[in-house]
């Protein structure tokens, strides 16, 4: 009985990571403060994120010996730390923080990436999100 009570308390105090599949309009609302940052418009961000993660915070992609996490597909070699490889951890954060529904830390790291690498860090941007962006606007905002 004591084990069950202990497990119940742990479950209440430490809930599971809450991942989220955003819609275009939900994500537009959350990311509105990124509009214009580094001269990147909100529709450019929405388009890029759609193509790299499908608006899904739990997206993990393994590529060339590294791993990319979350909506912004932030790489573990430079930007965040995990238990897989040695990382510079420039954003000073655990990679698993990019898998939850709190995008505050994701946006802070994405801005740092943009400042250091530019928008071309996200390959989908140049190929798919640099023109004809009307479809990425949310009329509900």
From Swiss-Prot:
The keyword Secreted applies. One of its GO terms (molecular function) is lysozyme activity. Pfam families: Lys. One of its GO terms (cellular component) is extracellular region. InterPro entries: Glyco_hydro_22 (IPR001916), Glyco_hydro_22_CS (IPR019799), Lactalbumin (IPR000545), Lysozyme-like_dom_sf (IPR023346). The keyword Lipoprotein does not apply. Residues 1-19 form the signal peptide. One of its GO terms (biological process) is lactose biosynthetic process. Mammary gland specific. Secreted in milk. PROSITE patterns: GLYCOSYL_HYDROL_F22_1, GLYCOSYL_HYDROL_F22_2. Keywords: Calcium, Disulfide bond, Lactose biosynthesis, Metal-binding, Milk protein, Secreted, Signal. Ca(2+) binds at residues 97, 100, 102, 105-106. It comes from the Eukaryota. The pig alpha-lactalbumin shows complete loss of both lysozyme functional residues. Belongs to the glycosyl hydrolase 22 family. Regulatory subunit of lactose synthase, changes the substrate specificity of galactosyltransferase in the mammary gland making glucose a good acceptor substrate for this enzyme. This enables LS to synthesize lactose, the major carbohydrate component of milk. In other tissues, galactosyltransferase transfers galactose onto the N-acetylglucosamine of the oligosaccharide chains in glycoproteins. Lactose synthase (LS) is a heterodimer of a catalytic component, beta1,4-galactosyltransferase (beta4Gal-T1) and a regulatory component, alpha-lactalbumin (LA). This is Alpha-lactalbumin.
């Amino acid at each position: 009985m004591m084990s069950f009570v202990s497990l119940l308390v742990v479950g209440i105090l430490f809930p599971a990571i809450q991942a989220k599949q955003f819609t275009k309009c939900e994500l537009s609302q959350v990311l509105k403060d990124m509009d214009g940052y580094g001269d990147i418009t909100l529709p450019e961000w929405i388009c890029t994120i759609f193509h790299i993660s499908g608006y899904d915070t739990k997206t993990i992609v393994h590529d060339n010996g590294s791993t990319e996490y979350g909506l912004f597909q932030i790489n573990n070699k430079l930007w965040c730390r995990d238990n897989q490889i040695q990382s510079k951890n420039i954003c000073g954060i655990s990679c698993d923080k990019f898998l939850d529904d709190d995008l505050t830390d994701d946006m802070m790291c994405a801005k740092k990436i943009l400042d250091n690498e530019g928008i071309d860090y996200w390959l989908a941007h140049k190929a798919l999100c640099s023109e004809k962006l009307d479809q990425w606007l949310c009329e509900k905002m």
